Amino acid sequence: AFGAQFVFTVSAHYSVREGKSDTSKAPNHLPWYDWDSCEEMVLPNKCKLVGVELIDDAIELPSFHHPKQAAYVLGPEMGSLSKEMIKKCDYTIKIPTKFCINVQIAGSIVMYDRIRSLGKFAQRPQTEVEQKDD
């Protein structure tokens, strides 16, 4: 979904390929990288790493200009990105919420924001548009 070109994990504590919640069966359609540590990560040339983390100095998602070539990394469910991973990130962004949200929801929000901001979609109207009756 959302035009992803590859998927990766770092220090995963489970087998992604056996995940029950992946209804799209991503490992069957996308290149998949499993790295044991941040040091082993090798992203494509010119690819910016964007961390998604609820920290004070992160850029709020609505203000973030997504790089055209980017990989997004999210922390584990009920956890956070490691300090090493945050240091490796070119940018750190946050979804402006008052509390943490499910990692799958966070990933979907970020990727939707990316496709919306980089896509060639028409501008939204400034006022409510009247709906046509069927």
Give, region by region, the residue ranges found by the protein language model.
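Post-transcriptional modification and biogenesis factors for structured RNAs
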Residues: A1-D134
